[in-house]
């Protein structure tokens, strides 16, 4: 089940679905109590009353500031399941690669020659689970509350697929005052944002994707700031671990 370079980006067999169901149940069983114990996690929804449920199809967008973000964000949409994108190197790891693939991981090849394959994988994810999750900063910046610029790929796929973007914001605060080292995590699901239509050609669509990414970025940053996100917690990019994120 481990991904190998050049292989299909999604795997949807009876065995992989069964293993995915087992792993999701296990993560749900231990993830919530563990997250509450370690981070006093709160999961909130900031939407109009008429749209409390997630859209049937959507691109999820998150800032990436904690190694456990995939667990937190999976809890935020549970019982819905989502495909999620991650580094190609992570999916190639012998054990971890198989686990994340069972859970719905879509590797993002560094080669620009596989852009069509990525678009096909996103379409597959939207057709089968309805949700595909992106971290458009490109990597994890531990403790960061000043979101780095977004890459436009996720927003391009939202425009091409005609599906809304749902921002899922991670807000970090110190639990007991500014001298505390303990972190309180709030995951807030914002209202869906309808993308602009496709442009007249690929270049025009890309330009719209960049503008759309900036719009969503600024909205998420404003949410962090008005909620008291504490950027003094920032510790820099997640260290490179060979076979995991390097």
Task: For each feature predicted by the language model, list its residue ranges.
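Non-catalytic C-terminal accessory region of glycerolipid acyltransferases
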Residues: 2-11, 15, 118-246
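A generic secondary-structure micro-motif detector
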Residues: 20-21, 85-86, 111, 119, ...
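Catalytic core of membrane glycerolipid acyltransferases/transacylases, capturing the structured
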Residues: 52-112
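Proline- and acidic/polar-enriched loop/turn elements at helix boundaries
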Residues: 48, 89, 112, 137, ...
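Short, flexible loop segments at the rims of nucleotide/cofactor-binding pockets, characterized by
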Residues: 34-40, 60-62, 108-113, 143-145
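Membrane-anchoring hydrophobic helices of lipid-metabolizing enzymes
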Residues: 1-59, 68-72, 97, 102, ...
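Short amphipathic alpha-helical segments and helix-helix/interface helices
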Residues: 31, 73-74, 97, 122, ...
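Structured helix-beta-strand junction loops
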Residues: 37, 80, 102-103, 128-129, ...
